[in-house]
Amino acid sequence: MVKLLLLNLLASIIFYTNIPLPYINGLDFQRVARLVPTVGLIIGGILGLFDGGMNYLGMPVLTRSALVVVLWIFITGGLHLDGAMDTADGLAVGDPERRLEVMADSATGAFGAMSAIAILLLKTSALTEIGEYRWLVLMAACGWGRWGQQVAIACYPYLKATGKGAFHKQAIRSYKDLLPGLCLMFAISGLFWLVNNHHLLISVVVLIAGSAIATLTAAWFNHKLGGHTGDTYGAVVEWTEALFLCVLTILT
């Protein structure tokens, strides 16, 4: 059981990131979405370690935050950011019937470029305003973003029968498949209180804000398109991360 879980986690990391790991024959990539919040926490942990190292070297917070965002893109290979860009291009089309066609086009349009700039600016500026427990904030942001992806998979129809993200529907079929990730994020939210018992309010806000932003972002894209695609899964991740960081600046 433990071996199978570790193999599934390895498959998820290989699928969703550029983290150099040995490839093992026979890995099952059909269920990678089940462990995607855990992958998010791993990504956030790496970003937190990098941020802490740069802080130790005396790097200014703005430069440090910008480098963290650059590393963020590198670790994920821009997978989710590309989806957010394609989604923005599709939503910019007035004709609903042409939106999926535009999203499938690999060429980046003006709205896609603007959405990428907006996401990167929001992440960088928000991180610059967050002074304490940045490692934990990064883990929470990455985790909630990917739990939002699970919400989109579980709760809404997939719009393409043979799309690149269609197989995720076989891994996450119902609301109960969201519970493991939610419990994991509940634990991460509780860490804010454990590291400082005066931060109980922050723990509660992290839990409520993270779950609400993830859920509402997935619902909004479903409202605009009538369902989801692999691109909108990426858009949910990126916008949940960015908006979550923005909300946390209020607490600091």
From Swiss-Prot:
GO terms for molecular function: adenosylcobinamide-GDP ribazoletransferase activity; cobalamin 5'-phosphate synthase activity. Pathway: Cofactor biosynthesis; adenosylcobalamin biosynthesis; adenosylcobalamin from cob(II)yrinate a,c-diamide: step 7/7. It is a multi-pass membrane protein. Its EC number is 2.7.8.26. It comes from the Bacteria. Belongs to the CobS family. PANTHER family: ADENOSYLCOBINAMIDE-GDP RIBAZOLETRANSFERASE (PTHR34148:SF1). Joins adenosylcobinamide-GDP and alpha-ribazole to generate adenosylcobalamin (Ado-cobalamin). Also synthesizes adenosylcobalamin 5'-phosphate from adenosylcobinamide-GDP and alpha-ribazole 5'-phosphate. This is Adenosylcobinamide-GDP ribazoletransferase. The gene is cobS.
